[in-house]
Design a protein with these regions (language model features):
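Hydrophobic/aromatic ligand-binding patch that stacks against planar heteroaromatic rings
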Residues: 63-65, 108, 191-192
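Intrinsically disordered or low-complexity boundary/linker segments at protein termini
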Residues: 13, 41, 46, 50, ...
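Charged helix-capping and loop-helix junction motifs
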Residues: 57-60, 103, 131, 184-189
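Small/aliphatic-rich secondary-structure junction motif
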Residues: 86-149, 163-170, 195, 207-209
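Glycine/Thr-rich phosphate-binding loops of Rossmann-like dinucleotide-binding domains
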Residues: 52-53, 97, 180-181
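N-terminal membrane-insertion helices
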Residues: 1-6
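Extended, hydrophobic interaction surfaces within ordered domains
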Residues: 25-66
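Structural beta-alpha unit
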Residues: 7-42, 138-190, 194, 198, ...
Length: 212
């Protein structure tokens, strides 16, 4: 089956970069996460949670997003390829600890000459807003900031903005943290893996945050 898939790829996209394959026995999430350490990007298919295989695929992709520091690109089952013209970067109010966190997003935007829309949902008086250093990291790139003060849940707010902008990709920043009362990574990323209708790029900020 793997050889058939490899041959099909060669027929569909002649001249593409070399394709190799491996079959490894083990639990899917830790195996994929361990392999991801040797690569720059993990690309996975994902589906909604309407039936068993969908739950399996969605849970696996979400689990890999949490288990690896390598960026993960989740492709919904019904997504079709189109050039990236608009990418929505949905952010919380925590700092981005280095430009390298955003480098995969910047490289994709450069490759497609895409516009980056930074989107933030204001969660109320305790909300600190968008880390201004994001603008510095994106200097020289086509980007803009957008805010929403809404009673909608964060995911619904993101979806509304994505649809309004007719975005081609959504990007989230997952965070490796010690103790933190913040639902953005765990809850929002999980829901997007199951619900998104466009490709989802999950980046990782590995700084340990110790809010109590």
């Amino acid at each position: 089956m793997m050889e058939d898939s490899k041959a099909w790829i060669h027929r569909q996209w002649p001249g593409h970069p070399p394709v190799t394959h491996s079959v490894i026995k083990g639990n899917d999430i830790p195996v994929i996460a361990a392999m991801a350490n040797d690569y720059d990007l993990v690309v996975m298919g994902t589906q909604g949670a309407s039936k068993f295989k969908d739950i399996f695929l969605g849970s696996t992709t979400n689990g890999v997003c949490k288990a690896t520091e390598t960026p993960v690109l989740a492709i919904p089952e019904n997504a079709s390829y189109c050039p990236l013209r608009k990418i929505v970067l949905a952010v919380d109010d925590y700092e981005v600890t280095g430009k390298k966190v955003l480098d995969p997003l910047i490289e994709l935007a450069d490759l497609h000459d895409a516009d980056i829309k930074i989107f933030h949902t204001d969660m109320g008086t305790a909300d600190l807003g968008v880390d201004p250093i994001i603008g510095m990291y994106l200097a020289g790139k086509e980007h803009s900031f957008h805010y929403a003060a809404t009673s909608l849940k964060i995911n619904d707010s993101i979806h509304e903005f994505v649809e309004t902008e007719k975005a081609d990709m959504l990007c989230l920043i997952g965070r490796k943290r010690a103790r933190i009362n913040n639902l953005f990574h765990r809850s929002v990323t999980k829901r997007e893996v199951f619900q998104t209708e466009i490709p989802l790029l999950v980046l990782t900020d590995i700084a340990v945050i110790t809010d109590f």
